[in-house]
Amino acid sequence: MKTLRLLAFTAALGLAVFTSRSAGQTGFQMLYVFTSNSSGAETVGVVPGPNGVLYGMTAGFYEGFGSVFELQPSGGKWTETVLYTFTGQNGDGANSWSQAIPIVASNGNIYGTTTGGGAYGGGAVFELQPPASGSGGPWTESVIYSFPSAGYGNFSNVIMGPNGILYGYTSGAGAYGQGMVFALAPPSQGGAGTWTERELYSFTGGIDGAYPAGLTAGPGGVLYGVAEDGGDFGEGAVFQLKPVNGAPAGAPWMETVLYSFLGGEAGANPFGPPVIGSGGVLYGTTVNSVFQLTPPGSSGGSWTGSMIYSFWNEDNGGPQSPIIVRNGAIYGLSSLLGGICYGTGGSAFELQKPAGPAGGLWTKTVLHQFYTNSEPYGSFVMDRNGALLGTTLGGPGGTYDGFLFKVDPSSAETEASNENPIPDGICGGDRFPLNRRRH
């Protein structure tokens, strides 16, 4: 069952043209360089844990099957500990993807997904349990769900909702082969047993969307997400999912399309989880823009979509990570992904809302320009001091290892950088398998 809503568009092409003030040089630090022989190649972002600890995953691909790692700050340095290395055998997971960022539950358990492996080769959802306090033992990994086949196209992470339920999506499979959103319920009363998977909604590939590419848990048990394709114009859509009142347990959820993208400079192919801001406003990214959706007022009506900033034809490429919305500003990463011969490795950017009346133009500041071998990608976080922490796909000297970086929007940076330029002869072909278009 689904409800499809006609859309209110305020994003005419004229709104896609924005001013941009001069790039400000800000404090940049390379905090830690990964080595593929210890943690696996290609880091795909970090998430915060307790006491300043960061957790993340490596994709593997060129170097093994990937891993889950911990980064611990101490005395101005960061120490990496590999918590678990995937084997790709005997039902274990193998390799992660662009959005497969783990989540850290309140009990310290880590949950995440892999693209391959599992009991049927279609990927898996895993749980990592920390050792008993003070024991110093290893983390314990369990595969809590295996996707039935490789056709499921599991490229998502999972998010946690009420009662420990995990939600996620696949870009394939479902009743129509266009992707689906699923729920994983833990064993009853937290004891031993089997997690239960349930399909909440299957996309048809029509105006309801196709190939989900981001999911966020909202208040009241509602889910918000984006679909890369489909919608009224075939360029992607933002959707809402919620249980149907009075429906029996296990019934499909109701989908409502909140916004359909027009394509081109007006935005196309959304990617990444929407961010819920003040007043229920949704913020998100497409391959070439940052957008916002404003919910209807108390009198009802449609959601109103507008483009905040267009990256159309910019040298640094489009947004490549979930954005952060803090104190009226938006922070994100841009990258060309594999475009290492284009003379840019992407950027960390800041978008500031207009100071004047509503309807003014947002301004963009490039906080840091990355060299061509870096390719910032995946989730990143803001620490308690307002600095941004993230990872890159590539590392110094053109390696696939990546590094952890810090960008401080409030401090000045000299023109010199401690990144190393890419060596000659590495251009050509798609350097990274982590392409955001996956179908």
Model-derived features: positions:
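Extracellular beta-propeller repeat domains
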Residues: 2-439
